[in-house]
Amino acid sequence: MTKVAAHRGATRPAHGRRTRPPPPLVAWPRRLLLALALAVAAPAAAGEPPAPIRLRVAGGLADLGQYTRREHPFWTQQVPEITGGRVQAEIAPFDRSGIRGQEMLQLIRLGVVPFGNVLLSLAASNDPELNGIDLPILNPDVATLRRTAAAWRPHLTALLRERYGVELLAMYTYPAQVIFCRQPFSGLSDLAGRRVRTSSIGQSELITGLDGIPVVIPFADTANALRSGVVECAITAAMSGNAVGLHEAASHLSRLAISWGVSVFAANRAAWKALPDDARTRIAEGLRRLEGEIWWDAELETENGIACNAGLDTCAGGRRGRMAVVESHAGDEARRARLLEEVVLPSWVRRCGSGCAETWNRYVAPAIGVRARER
């Protein structure tokens, strides 16, 4: 198993700002660590072809299309094919492998999980700077998300390499998370006074900034919470909400994306460098294609989720509802821009540190036109 020494003390990224060291990793059961480690093939006998290299990969969330349609076939079918059988891979979703998403990056850093999908919103609970790409209402549509991702990627690549010893190999996104409500609403301002299901610190801060009442509820309980009136609105993905019956529990949903769910596929640097050069090249090329497919899927699934909840003829694979779709308008866009500048970004900078405002203004502000204020 590849071993990577834990970082000692603070590290300094390429741009010169001192940053916090990676947070300590909690103790993990020995059996789990061994099961997730890189499987190294035994050396072949003289004259025999080399034994295949066997990789163990921690993928994204189970049961979602990103994993079932894209990640699993890529690693189990395409990787052996594009490497001529030189590399074989096993993959399992992290949430079915006894791994907390909050610890995935640390496990990759230590080499316990050599290759894994890191959901940035979860990793940000230890290091808020990681999720500067997917703050609430930062990316109201996929075109904006693409610009933000392209702007933030060079910094995120350097951060992961220098702070964690991890290589960013691909960047993925889940479909947009939108707002479902039991009663009519015409925009963000109408959420004042309403109890809203949220799933992250950033979403809760946004709802508080709108004078709403954030309520953190597990996704599986969201439909019942809406039906029973525990909450009046919920933030979740349009198609996922449709799958659990939110089109029957709510009457209106927004087209405006609140969050997305950006993740990175990352490798322990030592484990990545240990692969033969030609295998690395072919896998990297394959991951670039996979990234493009996943982004395309996220865009299509976002639109399809809205179509199904609204009962449109274009609905595919979902249950048709009769929901009203709340379109964005000029007043709502102005409110979104103010909230981003006055609530969302300041809240993130408070958690992240004043240096994060400087980083944001260097990388992201030129792409979207919104600057972060330093504390």
Model regions and ranges:
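Secondary-structure junction/capping motif
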Residues: 29, 65-66, 151, 155
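A short, compositionally biased domain-edge/stem linker segment
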Residues: 41-47
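Hydrophobic alpha-helical context, especially transmembrane and signal-peptide helices
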Residues: 26, 30, 75-76, 156, ...
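N-terminal secretory signal peptides that target proteins for export/translocation
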Residues: 1-27
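Bacterial N-terminal signal peptides
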Residues: 29-41
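N-terminal secretory/targeting leader peptides
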Residues: 47-143, 162-163, 167-375
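A gly/proline- and charged-residue-enriched helix-loop-helix capping module
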Residues: 140-157
